[in-house]
Amino acid sequence: MSDPRPNTLSPLATLTPPSSSRTWQTAPHPTLPIVATACSDRSVRVYSLTSFTLLHSITGGHKRSVRAVSWKPHTQGQSVLATGSFDSSAGIWRREEQGGNEDDFTNRRVGGAEDEDGRDDDDEDEYQFSCILDGHESEIKSLSWSPTGQYLATCSRDKSVWIWEELEDDNFETVAVLQEHDGDVKCVAWHPEEDLLASASYDDSVRLYREDSDDWVQVACIAGKEGHGMTVWWVEFEGSGISGKDFRVQRDGLSEEQTQHVDSMERSGPRLATCSDDRTVRIWRRKPRERAENASSNTGIPSIIRSAAIDEDWYQDAILPQVHERAIYSVSWSRTTGLIASAGSDGKIIIYKERWRKQTPNGVDTDNMQIDGSEPASLTEWFVLAELFSAHSVFEINHVTWAKRADKDKRYDGEEVIVSTGDEGEVKVWTLDEVADPPQRDA
């Protein structure tokens, strides 16, 4: 029997004015209560999450639709935005923030000289086009800054993944051109703690890369019978560390197997979420290297998957409940609560939550989640916490993400909202009304 779903997603706002053309993706700023939306009219629209109104319309840098946006982390005194376009180029935009420190910006929405509707009066406060990154032979589908902001990854319909390094004064150097995929590369995402990059593709595979002796190389490939059966649209890593609201954080009362499971997951590091045309959301987990190396040396039998010390083994940790009826375009893993949101072609937004299984398998090796393609023997399970139909009327949802809530009706510090980006040009903001905690495993 499926779990009851008393939790609801309630509409909070539609960002105004909406775009008159298709919107592809919305990226929350890492520190400010604003989001940037990539639009088919060749613009990027920057909205306030305080007033839900348009603050800036960034134009003039691209000749075709803007497909992807990504804010650079850890900037001081300025906001830096990367944009990827169907014109095959990536753009870098900068805005010098007026006001002093990030807390001032947050309290005053985005800082600078603004009138009552949140618009800037001074053209100098607008985003300035800084530089263009050329190299791809076809449209850019996704881009992402590394956790430190040192690298920018881009991917394209030309089947390649590029890694750029910013040197100084808007001078970017190409440090890698990775051509492991056999099809259109849909998405790239960085690990939150390491310079480890994941990519998803039309070739149904997920690939992971890292630097080895000054060269970027593929260290893992998730494909075939262990992977998705159709196009993989999105990849996103779990947040760094275990959230204070995560069900695993309270160790009192856990069984020995559960405690071992938590320890093993901490050794594995953040997991990876993917979604696909095959209508599934899947979670992948890295096999802890210490156990892998010890097992190989103790038996004298090397891993059949790993061909070198730098290679990694990633196993399927879970397939989330299959609720979507058509392709899933986007997943977002909350770094505050550990909840996952998904959205796609069927217009649904689904929220999933992880918990301990009521009955756990006996004798589970928590470091080996899957063997020879068999189903993973996990101690946890995911269930549907909330489900919303027709979130954008009859239109597809191209992207979904979690963001910090910043309006005056915020219910508590750290509250999050869900931001969905639709094919009709609207960006909508939703609250999750969680009225009951799920039942937990008996101690």
UniProtKB/Swiss-Prot annotation:
WD repeats lie at residues 14-57, 61-103, 135-174, 180-219, 221-248, 255-294, 323-362, 391-440. SUPFAM superfamilies: WD40 repeat-like. Residues 113-124 have a biased composition (Acidic residues). It comes from the Eukaryota. Transmembrane segments: none annotated. One of its GO terms (cellular component) is cytosolic [4Fe-4S] assembly targeting complex. The keyword Signal does not apply. Residues 8-21 have a biased composition (Low complexity). The keyword Repeat applies. Residues 1-27, 95-124 are annotated as: Disordered. GO terms for biological process: iron-sulfur cluster assembly. Keywords: Repeat, WD repeat. PROSITE patterns: WD_REPEATS_2, WD_REPEATS_REGION. Essential component of the cytosolic iron-sulfur (Fe/S) protein assembly machinery. Required for the maturation of extramitochondrial Fe/S proteins. Belongs to the WD repeat CIA1 family. This is Probable cytosolic iron-sulfur protein assembly protein 1.
